[in-house]
Amino acid sequence: MASNDKGLEEIPEGQIESNYDEITDSFDAMDLKPELLRGVYAYGFERPSAIQQRAILPIIKGNDVIAQAQSGTGKTATFSISALQKLDPNVKGCQALILAPTRELAQQIQKVVVAIGDFMNIECHACIGGTNVREDMKALQEGPQVVVGTPGRVQDMIQRRVLRTDNLKMFILDEADEMLSRGFTEQIYDIFQLLPQSTQVVLLSATMPQDVLEVTTKFMRDPVRILVKKQELTLEGIKQFYIAVEKEEWKLDTLSDLYETVTITQAVIFCNTRRKVDWLTDKLTARDFTVSAMHGDMEQAQRDVIMKEFRSGSSRVLIATDLLARGIDVQQVSLVINYDLPANRENYIHRIGRGGRFGRKGVAINFVTADDVRMMREIEQFYSTQIEEMPMNVAGKFNHVDISLD
């Protein structure tokens, strides 16, 4: 961990430049512990994704690493595998600390760490707001080797000296851009001050705004910079359409028409506000569509139940705000509908990346009013992609779009 303020102006905002291009194209060639390798294959990975091929080895070697890659590219497994390789299962106490912007994402990361580390005899605890502080303290006193959490609760636990950092080897910031844009900057800076100087820092971010670059220059030592380019990842395998909707009020009927023509495995519908999520849920329920809804106003326990039902497939359609775009990995999501276009272009990839994770096929449909056209063009330009108009037949009905996952 470094503390210097070298000129930020040298780094163009938005994208880092890679300074590392070595690729390891199989997990076998990474020299992982046998019990970790077994966990990687048991989890269902066959070969490393673009980010895994580039980032796992420099992290294992102990370099500070900045990795810029979008959601759905295998980032979570990248740092989970690296952290598990470096841990000593015989030592109790936090050796890898992972920060995430939302509770859902923290829990998702915990599941991945536990699953990949299944044969290693390690403990991983999720330290998140909205849960009982006493239970958190009790779990941390047992000395789990990996702790993943949201910035507020993690900072609190370190300050109470319940989360000890004496054995800490690695500090990982996932979705750094989102954490900083959610106002966690102060907590993150405080956490850095509380960590041993020797801690290795790994930062992952889809975008590189100025506030993220400041963190990298202040707290990282000669970091290895890895950029998985937008073209390499983004929206391959995801068909993108838009439906021109003349007025906001017509979106609901458009959605009902879609429901009748589209065969869906599972779908997520994104709205920009919590109120809109509740409103749309009520309207669709009144029309006899089965949907569930999720947003940040809900109690944690309620959110957990909804996610569980959605993951198991007992609920097929989930209406959500962007909160969800960062913490959900449901294998079967084949359709994403942007009832509202996202307020910023970075969130577009997080939303529709749900619909084609790890190279699976998916479809994204955007409802676009006259006011949204400019934003849609910006999104197309930013991701070098094309969003085509949804095909209609002569009767003005939507053509059947095949959203199967074969």
UniProtKB/Swiss-Prot annotation:
Cellular compartment(s): Cytoplasm
Lineage top rank: taxon: Eukaryota
Motif DEAD box: where in chain: 174-177
Every Helicase ATP-binding domain range: 56-226
Residues binding ATP: A69, Q70, S71, G72, T73, G74, K75, T76
CDD domains cross-referenced by the UniProt entry: DEADc_EIF4AII_EIF4AI_DDX2, SF2_C_DEAD
The entry's keywords: ATP-binding, Cytoplasm, Helicase, Hydrolase, Initiation factor, Nucleotide-binding, Protein biosynthesis, RNA-binding
Residue positions of motif Q motif: 25-53
Pfam families: DEAD (PF00270), Helicase_C (PF00271)
Transmembrane segments: none
UniProt subunit comment: Component of the eIF4F complex, which composition varies with external and internal environmental conditions. It is composed of at least eIF4A, eIF4E and eIF4G.
Family note: Belongs to the DEAD box helicase family. eIF4A subfamily.
Name of this protein: ATP-dependent RNA helicase eIF4A
Organism of origin: Aspergillus fumigatus (strain ATCC MYA-4609 / CBS 101355 / FGSC A1100 / Af293) (Neosartorya fumigata)
Recorded name of the encoding gene: tif1
